[in-house]
Amino acid sequence: MTTPISTSRAASIVSSILPYSRYLKRVLENESELQQELLEQLHNPFTREEMLGFLQDSTAHLIDEADLHRLLRQLRKRVILRLAARDLAGLADLNEVMATMTALADVTIQFSLEFLHAAMVQPGHFGKPKGEKTGTEQQLLIVAMGKLGGGELNVSSDVDLVFIYPEDGETDGSKSITNHEFFLRLGRKLIASLNDYTVDGYVFRVDMRLRPYGENSPLAISLPMLEDYFVTQGREWERHAWIKSRVITGSSIAEAALMELIVRPFVFRKYLDFEAYEAMRSLHTQLRKEVDRRELHDNIKLGPGGIREIEFITQVFQLIRGGRDADLCIRPTLGVLQRLKQKQPLPEQTVEELIEAYYFLRKLEHRLQYLDDQQTQNLPQHSDDQILIAKSMGFTDYTGFLKHLDLHRQNVTRHFEQIFAVRRKAIKLGTFARIRPEQTNDNEIVKVFSNQLKTLGYIDPDKITARVQQFYDGTTFRQLSHPNQERILELMPTLMEVVTRFPPVEITLERMLRLLEKIGQYSAYLALLQEYPQTLPRVAKLVSISQWASDYLGSHPILLDELLAPSGLHTLPDWPTLKTELIHQLHHGNIPKAQIIEWQMDVLRHFQHAQVFRLLAVDLEGNLLLETLSDHLTALADLILDNVLQLAWQGLKKKHRKSPAFAIIGYGKLGGKELGYVSDLDIVYLYQDNHPDAMEIYTKLAQNINLWLTSHTSAGVLYETDLRLRPNGTSGLLVNSIEAFSLYQHEQAWVWEHQALTRARFVIGDSEVGEKFEQMRKNILCQPRDMENLKREILMMRTKMLEAHPNSTPLFDVKHDHGGIIDVEFIVQYLVLGYAHRYPQLTSNIGNIALLKLAGELGLTSAEKANAAFIAYRELRRTQHQLRLSGIPEATGTALPKDVSQKFARVTSDYLSSARRAVFQLWEDVFGT
């Protein structure tokens, strides 16, 4: 609440600030009745409600458009008087100034439109415009652009407007005209009500040049015309212009939402749009030429280091990332800067300096305009005005003021040039090897290229030259658009040099070329590599180590963005923080309702892919235990399942309670917390609910969950799922009550199903259902069993698994063959099922290594052999993991095809002989065979 100011104090304040505004002084001298009103209300901001009240109090006296013009101008005069006085006196901050001017524009436009529309549809006139398809009455959608759209209007600003109407059709009055003609006439009248200069002044100058097709086009167009324009003719600079667009009038929220469906996809691409850099450079170059031509170097908006450059900085990040990050799809410049500060695509100090400069420049802009109520951003040339401006900005002299101004402008210029630097021009020639497709048959040029490769350090330059020729001659490259071919050609010299740093060079080059083939159709990602050439060595390093990393990047090229700030790639995830971040992303998208599910699906996939990629980067550094990696991959899956369960439940139309009495049970690698990068999720769904429709509801919920996980969207898949471990397998019910599941486990389950239960755990969902499952699991595992029968059943199952995965090669299959991973898992499962009735601690879900150690400590098998076996198990899993990552099991001495090495992880029989021996010895100790 504002503190009242006495009239005498207010008079003193007004007197002190009048030298800084000749406009205020002139108005108060000519219209003395406004002075008392100003003194009485100086302590109060001029609110939207007060503006509306002023207009509505005079509605009864409005007869014609002349009355409307007069009333709007009287309001404008009062608002400017109080706002200027409050601002110059230090009673209003920048946010109040921008908000008040924006409110004035919104209120006057809306009031004027309502009055004029009502007059045009009166009986005996044109009548109401009706849509030819819907038959509903049509209203003019006025789209505020620029500073008005962003809620940051200055005190003597144009208002940039675009007029849209929903449908073509005709009016229903006696003087029927087309909707197009109706809204043209309405638009002209509205512009006149704001823009025309009368004895009472004006309200706002109106600029319509941002409308589709520009100033030579119709004043108003239909929504279908707008959509067609964006799809067929929309230009890059118009994406920049429409960032701040805001619908300020219209007949319904639905029409505003329709605008969102049309405008948002045009402005914000679904991918990371690094091409925006080049578009912004081009736009800024044009602006600089205009500044030079018009000699606007002292213009604090358009000149170097001015307001426009700050806006360009914020908007380039919005255009690049807004399609992925809805937090950046906001309008105010300061708001975007604050979010850039939080998200840190720019250093915090950079953002702070930009914010400080923006505040200073906008404050100065307003003081320049207060002088004579002129739309100017030029520094004054007359010495008297220079002194006034300096003092109004809090400086004793103009020299000191200029020094401070120059500091801000230099900061803005420096940051702008760093962000928009033409990095590609920095590629030096020297020894960089380059050859173009049309030159691959020119023997002389090919020879020069080969010599350049030799200089760079390539051992077999002729072979590499042939591979590059093959790349250029390949169908994939030839089918790319010409601009994308040129982008790749610009990248190639740098790529050829970078590859030499990461042996084995031939393999690294091959993977880089294949990666380029995969991402070559996406100009945005090629632009990323051009704008940030430092990412190329980071990519080369990853792919040189891992074929799987190369394939993953090729499948999800959006992950190249993760390499821009590599510091984040070298730290393990903070899951509580990431959980908060994911929830925010999922539920703060400001996405049209019709698109929200697709949006959330993509958010989940982008999040999951990014976390996997970050873990991969840490993993490839060689400092991450496989168990730790699996723990993190499992934590990621748990987090995804938690959110998917909630989203799937929210999406159910038929439900009878706030939250489901439902649990997701993890089996296999998910249950045992041993997930790898591409592991399926083995899942069973349970519920406990006596509602008569419970089975139907939870079946639909389970189907929805599976849909969320396995659907192929533009961002790929979250997880493949395996639901076959539920009671009766694929022929069984998709969901089971906890009672039915317990009965099945006690009376019908096979031994192999109890083996699977040893690795099961409650993952997410209703805690009561989860607790009952865990208790039931423990009861089942702790049942006394006939040891000979148990042994026979487990050995039979092991034989079946060997038959299902025959190995006809002389190589050792690390997972499936005897002495491998599955042998260890079967040993553990046998010990748990055989002895848990005596040692319930064996039912703890602590992983195979810890259970082997515990079995040895309990004397269930030789402690020495158990310890040797868990060391072997760790080595087997590590080898399997490394082979699948590399795609080339170099340790075997055999270059296997990728599909074989990655699917089966096989090595020469002598490579893991000590580990196999340890497993064999424990197997013999436990099973006697």
From Swiss-Prot:
It catalyses: [glutamine synthetase]-O(4)-(5'-adenylyl)-L-tyrosine + phosphate = [glutamine synthetase]-L-tyrosine + ADP; [glutamine synthetase]-L-tyrosine + ATP = [glutamine synthetase]-O(4)-(5'-adenylyl)-L-tyrosine + diphosphate. The keyword Transcription does not apply. Residues 1-422 are annotated as: Adenylyl removase. The keyword ATP-binding applies. GO terms for biological process: regulation of glutamine family amino acid metabolic process. It is an enzyme of class 2 (transferase). GO terms for cellular component: cytosol. Coiled coil: none annotated. PANTHER family: BIFUNCTIONAL GLUTAMINE SYNTHETASE ADENYLYLTRANSFERASE_ADENYLYL-REMOVING ENZYME (PTHR30621:SF0), GLUTAMINE SYNTHETASE ADENYLYLTRANSFERASE (PTHR30621). Belongs to the GlnE family. This is Bifunctional glutamine synthetase adenylyltransferase/adenylyl-removing enzyme. It comes from Nitrosomonas eutropha (strain DSM 101675 / C91 / Nm57).
